[in-house]
Amino acid sequence: MITKDKIRVRLFSFDVKILDQSAESIVRAVQKSKAQIKGPIPLPTKIKKYTVLRSPHVNKKSREQFEMRTHKRLIDILEPTSALMDSLMKLELPAGVEVDIKQ
């Protein structure tokens, strides 16, 4: 039997370490409530590259490149309870992690 009660939690961050720590804290909170969990599933890293001139006046060939990497994780929670939702909303996550919760 397939149930339609599912919560999808997506995590975004520029730092992999705090992203994995946040995912583990969410997994521990879900395991305490005895709900089924799928994940954390690593999603493809989005890389934005910026090229700028090193000198404002001359040396067009001299350039510098910067990149910004956005790491993502996906966690599916099957058959969530209202107590689990309250604990997820009250969960303290480090700064720099964006959380997107959808049903």
Swiss-Prot record:
InterPro entries: Ribosomal_uS10, Ribosomal_uS10_dom, Ribosomal_uS10_dom_sf. The keyword Mitochondrion does not apply. GO terms for molecular function: structural constituent of ribosome; tRNA binding. SUPFAM superfamilies: Ribosomal protein S10 (SSF54999). One of its GO terms (biological process) is translation. Keywords: Ribonucleoprotein, Ribosomal protein. SMART domains: Ribosomal_S10. One of its GO terms (cellular component) is ribonucleoprotein complex. Pfam families: Ribosomal_S10 (PF00338). Involved in the binding of tRNA to the ribosomes. Belongs to the universal ribosomal protein uS10 family. Part of the 30S ribosomal subunit. This is Small ribosomal subunit protein uS10. It comes from Borrelia turicatae (strain 91E135).
